[in-house]
Structure formats: C-alpha cells, structure tokens
C-alpha cells in the first residue's frame, strides 16, 4: 500500500472526517533532506471532522500526528496539517 493511501485509511478510520485531502508534495522537495527515492515523504493533509469540536489547533494536530505515528516514524519526513471543525470549514 502506498503511503498516501495508508494516511487516508488511518485518518478515515480514526477521525471519521467529513472531508479529507491527502496531497503528496514530495516532488517539490526532491533532492532536499529527508526526500526518498520514489517520493512519498512530504505530505499535506486537510481534514474536517466533528471530533475536533472544542479542541485547540495544537490538540487537533497532536491527534492527527498520534494517528499517523507509524508513518511519521518511517516513510514520512514532513507533514503539514490543516484540521478544522465543520463550522470552521463552512
């Protein structure tokens, strides 16, 4: 399974998002520190979930990072997260 699919599957299972985008930005970082042959090392995640209600931005990011701990310990070098509630997302 590719890394983007693993990220999508784990976030979908754990956070029940109303919207989820997983963007592989690895090509933009080719040749930089942490880049891997074949990419799949730099990602952006945009997620909207009602589970974020009442949580600070930091707490939301920590929840996403905890959900993806295995990927962050291995193939993922960089992860940018935008985590919003349904009301914030509009």
Task: Describe each region flagged by the PLM.
Residues 1, 89-90:
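Basic/polar N-terminal segments that are highly enriched at the extreme N-terminus
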């Amino acid at each position: 399974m590719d890394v983007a699919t693993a990220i999508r599957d784990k976030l979908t299972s754990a956070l029940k998002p109303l919207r989820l985008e997983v963007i592989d930005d690895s090509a933009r970082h080719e040749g930089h520190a942490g880049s891997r042959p074949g990419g799949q090392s730099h990602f952006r995640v945009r997620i909207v979930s009602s589970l974020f209600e009442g949580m600070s931005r930091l707490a939301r990011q920590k929840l996403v990072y905890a959900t993806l701990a295995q990927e962050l310990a291995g193939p993922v070098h960089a992860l940018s997260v935008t985590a919003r509630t349904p009301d914030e997302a509009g």
